[in-house]
Curated annotation (Swiss-Prot):
Keyword annotations of the record: Cytoplasm, Methyltransferase, rRNA processing, S-adenosyl-L-methionine, Transferase
Family note: Belongs to the methyltransferase superfamily. RsmJ family.
GO molecular function, one term: rRNA (guanine-N2-)-methyltransferase activity
Location of this chain's protein in the cell: Cytoplasm
Catalyzed reactions: guanosine(1516) in 16S rRNA + S-adenosyl-L-methionine = N(2)-methylguanosine(1516) in 16S rRNA + S-adenosyl-L-homocysteine + H(+)
GO CC term, one of those recorded: cytoplasm
Function text: Specifically methylates the guanosine in position 1516 of 16S rRNA.
Keyword Heme part of the UniProt annotation: no
InterPro entries assigned: 16SrRNA_methylTrfase_J, SAM-dependent_MTases_sf
Name of the protein this chain belongs to: Ribosomal RNA small subunit methyltransferase J
Length: 266
């Protein structure tokens, strides 16, 4: 992980020490991001969980993996179910909820949507920073759901996470372990600043970086999947690996390129 300081109050120092040792992070106890001037980003551990926060008084909001409130939870409750474009892209239908490998998990938002639709998710994330944020979000969601939301608990229990490079993970799969669907949403440089991308997410992208080897991942995914590979792309972006998909589903700002290996089960 990049050497980003981990900031916490004294109450959270013991938990922060464990996290800092795991990811080799410096700890700053008692400091607050607003007054830190010698680094651009910090990780903050407090009662709301783990978050990435830009420093300074005019910094945008914190970035965290969140599944119990906000837009992600609203989509779980009111998002349109199997009629959503992502559901159609991966092949969710009555009687079939595919096993999905999310090879570029990020903050887990698309994986969570698929899990709400009944899919079992294996999420792979190679960035230690993003892995730490996502693991924390899943742990908080599990604790919350176990206490007060059994339906959410079923969703979260369909999501598994591994810290690994997806290429290495795929190469280690035996044929009987191949997922039904592999989902790719690689991170690319923004061609322009979009009003649709919040300032805090632009900051997140700037520190996490881009998936420059994404073109290599597509052919590898096609060799290690049962039914299809789904690639999420900005609507006007070129095809991944310059490879023409079997078909596409287009939305207002993004699209899904679907590469089929064989027909989904009826």
């Amino acid at each position: 992980m990049l050497s980003i300081p981990l900031v916490c109050s004294s109450d959270f120092a013991p938990a922060a020490q464990v996290l800092a040792q795991e990811f080799n992070l410096p700890i700053r106890v008692g400091e607050v991001p607003e007054t830190i001037g010698d680094c651009e980003f910090v990780l903050v551990l407090d009662e709301t969980g783990l978050a990435l926060q830009q420093t300074g008084r005019k910094a945008p909001g914190a970035v965290r993996a969140e599944f119990t409130e906000g837009a992600v939870d609203h989509r779980r409750k009111f998002g349109g179910g199997k009629g959503q474009m992502i559901a159609k892209a991966v092949g969710v239908k009555a009687g079939f909820s595919p096993r999905v490998l999310d090879a570029t998990a990020g903050l887990g938002r698309d994986a969570f949507v698929l899990a709400t639709l009944g899919c079992r998710l294996q999420m792979i994330e190679r960035s230690p920073l993003v892995f730490a944020l996502l693991r924390d979000g899943l742990a908080r969601a599990h604790a919350f759901a176990h206490a007060q939301d059994r339906e959410l608990l079923q969703v979260v229990e369909r999501m598994e996470l591994a810290a690994q490079d997806s290429k290495t993970y795929l190469q280690g799969l035996a044929p009987e372990q191949f997922p039904d669907v592999i989902y790719l949403d690689p991170m690319f440089p923004e061609r322009q600043k979009s009003a649709d991308v919040k300032k805090e997410m632009r900051a997140f992208h700037s520190i996490v970086g881009t998936d420059e080897d994404a073109d290599v991942l597509l052919p590898l995914a096609l060799e290690h999947v049962r039914f299809r590979v789904v690639v999420k792309r900005p609507r006007k972006a070129p095809f991944l690996n310059n490879q023409i998909p079997s078909y596409q589903l287009e939305g207002k700002s993004s699209r899904y390129d679907i590469y089929t290996r064989k027909k989904l089960p009826d």
